[in-house]
Amino acid sequence: MKAQPIRAAVRIIGIDPGLRRTGWGVIESEGNRLIYVGCGSVEPPDDLPLANRLLAIHEGLAKVLNDFQPLEAAVEQTFVNKDGVATLKLGQARGIAMLAPAMFGISVAEYAPNQVKKTVVGAGHADKGQIAVMLKILLPKAEPPSADAADALAIAITHAHHRQGQALRMKVAGL
């Protein structure tokens, strides 16, 4: 009988970037098992100038990264809406969300919002309520304080599923 390989848990942080509230969620993925670790959000004061809000987001994420020590990160891609200025500002928050883990030497994956919904719920156009229901099933101990924290957990789950699929494809290919 062949011994089963030991599967080490991988700690993953999901980040849902935003200027008002940047959600974060940390899980551990071990084989098919997902374990809730923590979640929350970084909320810079609205009255700060943009540069200072971006700094507050960076400092908040750096604290979370230092406290939870994830090995991998995933960030939601920005969707382009009709308000070009708002899209550009959100892109700046997303840049900070990608920079913070990179400064800790953590690789960062990116996922489109509909890819996150499809992975977690099974439908690319799922609503926040459907995501919340699936989070309760997949991570029963999680009680996200905001929709942004819930989205961040969904992003982390998406990364866990996609990295597992990638590892399986590499194993089948003999790499």
Curated annotation (Swiss-Prot):
Residues given in the record as Mg(2+) 1 binding sites: D16, D148
Cofactor note: Binds 2 Mg(2+) ion per subunit.
Catalytic activity of the protein: Endonucleolytic cleavage at a junction such as a reciprocal single-stranded crossover between two homologous DNA duplexes (Holliday junction)
GO molecular function, one term: DNA binding
Residues engaged in binding Mg(2+) 2: E76
Compartments where found: Cytoplasm
GO biological-process terms attached to the record: DNA recombination; DNA repair
Protein keywords: Cytoplasm, DNA damage, DNA recombination, DNA repair, DNA-binding, Endonuclease, Hydrolase, Magnesium, Metal-binding, Nuclease
Pfam family, one: RuvC
Listed InterPro entries: RNaseH-like_sf (IPR012337), RNaseH_sf (IPR036397), X-over_junc_endoDNase_Mg_BS (IPR020563), X-over_junc_endoDNase_RuvC (IPR002176)
Known EC number: 3.1.21.10
Active site per the UniProt annotation: D16, E76, D148
One CC-aspect GO term: cytoplasm
Assembly mode: Homodimer which binds Holliday junction (HJ) DNA. The HJ becomes 2-fold symmetrical on binding to RuvC with unstacked arms; it has a different conformation from HJ DNA in complex with RuvA. In the full resolvosome a probable DNA-RuvA(4)-RuvB(12)-RuvC(2) complex forms which resolves the HJ.
Family stated for the protein in its record: Belongs to the RuvC family.
UniProt function note: The RuvA-RuvB-RuvC complex processes Holliday junction (HJ) DNA during genetic recombination and DNA repair. Endonuclease that resolves HJ intermediates. Cleaves cruciform DNA by making single-stranded nicks across the HJ at symmetrical positions within the homologous arms, yielding a 5'-phosphate and a 3'-hydroxyl group; requires a central core of homology in the junction. The consensus cleavage sequence is 5'-(A/T)TT(C/G)-3'. Cleavage occurs on the 3'-side of the TT dinucleotide at the point of strand exchange.
Protein name (record): Crossover junction endodeoxyribonuclease RuvC
